[in-house]
């Protein structure tokens, strides 16, 4: 197979994270829907595509921070055959996700390889009509300590799992064990209506029932030895909003009920559990302006309140179980993000403050302790500096005026190395 490198980059700067995650999810993690991986579709989501002889046979989508890459192998019609999604930490792979397709945009095999040498393998099987009817899940861990193992496993174009030298990988080293199997059932026109998960490590079976027309879940059950242990029933409004959840357990005499209320635009205005109000939200022009969380175990007293006076401003209040104000938080992000917190004693006097200011290049956090007389007893301040790619490059700590600084290269912390990948 020819290998022409195609680098695909997102054009929108403000939503690069969201677009990347959504794009990867659309392409890789939904086995029920045929893959939307044609070249035309990919080009619409990208800034540029490099073609060879008018065809793309390999491709790469690169995360803006260069910490995540997704490499693709296509056939001549633009269908994805192999996908390799890897997240980098420093200069090695922190997690690897490998995907193999059948050339008809159906997922056949997937691997999740973690830096801790833990492995997850899924196998997918389809009916003659092309519907997914079984998924087998395996888990394992490599026998010896080999932290770079996740970095060089990959699929060859013919679908074989290979090592860094291109030879067939020794799967037996992974000690894979079959954990559970998921079976899928459909109605007469191919709509998913039931999902059954049978586990080999746990004596139990999980079943999920769906509405074939809307795809919404209707019921979840857990069985042990043929006896139903748990059941969740879901009821929706005519508009499709979740209205009620009923939970039953074989050891409980009465069911537990959750109920949701909405305004005309579908915004959730109230959440009740067993008839008691747990959360209420007030909206103005489709935007939340107030949310109150109540303590259902203490007569329905408010324990948290959040106000949004403006789109870039938020105020949070937390009450103690004895109804005195415990903490207040003020958040603004106009011209830089700022988070201010105040802590109070039972008589209403403050006993501490915390302020955090952060931008794309730095974060500054200050904490003060206050005694009963209102005097500041201690001050601590932390300063973190970042480069343009988000790497931590400076770190200072000040306690009561005494400054400590650290060389980031010798400081024993985890940070991302955003070096350009090749």
Where are these regions (language model features)?
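Buried hydrophobic residues that stabilize the cores of well-folded domains
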Residues: 20-422
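Positively charged N-terminal leader segments that act as targeting/secretion signals
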Residues: 1-14
